[in-house]
């Protein structure tokens, strides 16, 4: 069995995927690199096959009809032989020194008595034109030791475990029934959210591992693109609302974190609907909040009466301007767009 499987969802990625693949190859025989060609129209499939030929036993090319990012991740989970699993998008990469430290620690943890469910490391926003890179650290978590939710501190606003920071135990992803929707953007939020109640033991290493590239005009986190795909953001938001009755999550720290995560996703949905400026999207905003209210009145009041919820729901044009100002401030803090 391999120690760590990397899945690289790849769609028309010929211009940048090799940088990603090359950053993962130093893992050698400890790792498995699954390049999932999601029905690409360019040379992505050819490049994937070329690396499979060059690095047999390490790189595998998987070809499928286009199913979107979520189905590419699903294919990775289905085909993974590693004890642990990580998604690396084809325009991102990893830092060599942090990578070597993580592999060494995973080897140690794999041979221990405690089953590790989730490994967390920092990620860096590699934003074009920005000299000082924002690093997402997790100061509320114990460092360099296995811990449980009981030992975790409270996450600050703007501190979220994203796909970029997490390595899951592969079997946990299968056992929790994770199946991401096809042809849908923003499913990475479901990827990190759904397994959380199944996570018992975690480990955090304060190293800047994952390099998250931001800057392509067609990127899904580009604000203009997000507004154009707002129906998919709302779909993901509703799936997350439906997934759990958060009031039944027994561990208070896990419950608090999951409320915060659902809150920021709902804030992003709401503010994109406001920023679009169309009456149709303002109606979708009202419908989203009605959906939450009809689904769980306590959840509605919890989200609505928080600082973010209040800022997002101030009435009239003046209220919408304040909402946008609050969003711009949170954007600088969180760096989610």
Across the structure, where does each feature detected by a protein language model lie?
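Short aromatic/hydrophobic "clamp" motif used to bind/position activated sugar donors
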Residues: 85
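Donor-binding/catalytic cores of nucleotide-activated saccharide
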Residues: 69, 93-202, 218-226
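Nucleotide-sugar-dependent glycosyltransferase catalytic core
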Residues: 184, 198-236, 276-283
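A conserved acidic beta->alpha catalytic loop
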Residues: 23, 37-46, 68
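Short beta-strand/loop segment that forms part of the nucleotide-sugar
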Residues: 30-39, 60-65, 89-90
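Glycine-rich, basic loop-to-helix element that forms the pyrophosphate-binding segment
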Residues: 64-80
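Membrane-interface aromatic/basic loop that binds lipid-linked glycans or pyrophosphate carriers
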Residues: 275-337
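Short, well-formed alpha-helical segments that are part of the catalytic scaffolds
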Residues: 12-26
């Amino acid at each position: 069995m391999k120690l760590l499987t990397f899945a690289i969802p790849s769609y028309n990625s010929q211009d940048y995927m090799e940088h990603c693949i090359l950053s993962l190859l130093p893992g050698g025989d400890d790792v498995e690199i699954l390049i999932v060609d999601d029905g690409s129209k360019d040379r992505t499939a050819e490049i994937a096959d070329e690396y499979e030929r060059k690095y047999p036993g390490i790189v595998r090319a998987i070809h499928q009809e286009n199913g979107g990012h979520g189905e590419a991740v699903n294919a990775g989970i289905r085909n993974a032989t590693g004890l642990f699993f990580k998604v690396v998008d084809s325009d991102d990469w990893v830092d060599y020194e942090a990578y070597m430290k993580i592999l060494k620690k995973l080897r140690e943890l794999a041979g221990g008595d405690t089953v590790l469910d989730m490994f967390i490391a920092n990620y860096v926003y590699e934003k074009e034109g920005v000299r000082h890179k924002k690093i997402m650290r997790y100061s509320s978590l114990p460092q360099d030791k296995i811990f449980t939710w009981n030992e975790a501190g409270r996450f600050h606003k703007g501190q979220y475990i994203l796909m970029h920071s997490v390595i899951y135990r592969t079997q946990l992803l299968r056992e929790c029934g994770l199946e991401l929707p096809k042809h849908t953007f923003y499913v990475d939020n479901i990827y990190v959210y759904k397994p959380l109640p199944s996570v018992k033991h975690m480990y955090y290493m304060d190293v800047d591992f994952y390099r998250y590239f931001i800057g392509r005009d067609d990127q899904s986190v580009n604000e203009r693109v997000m507004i154009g795909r707002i129906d998919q953001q709302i779909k993901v938001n509703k799936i997350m609302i439906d997934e759990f009755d958060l009031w039944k999550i027994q561990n208070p720290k896990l419950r608090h974190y999951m409320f915060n995560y659902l809150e920021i996703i709902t804030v992003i949905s709401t503010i994109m609907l406001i920023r679009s400026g169309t009456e149709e999207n303002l109606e979708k905003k009202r419908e989203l909040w009605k959906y939450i209210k009809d689904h769980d009145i306590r959840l509605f009041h919890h989200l609505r009466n928080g600082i973010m919820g209040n800022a997002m729901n101030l009435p009239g044009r003046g209220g919408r301007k304040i909402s946008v100002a609050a969003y711009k401030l949170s954007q600088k803090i969180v760096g989610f767009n």
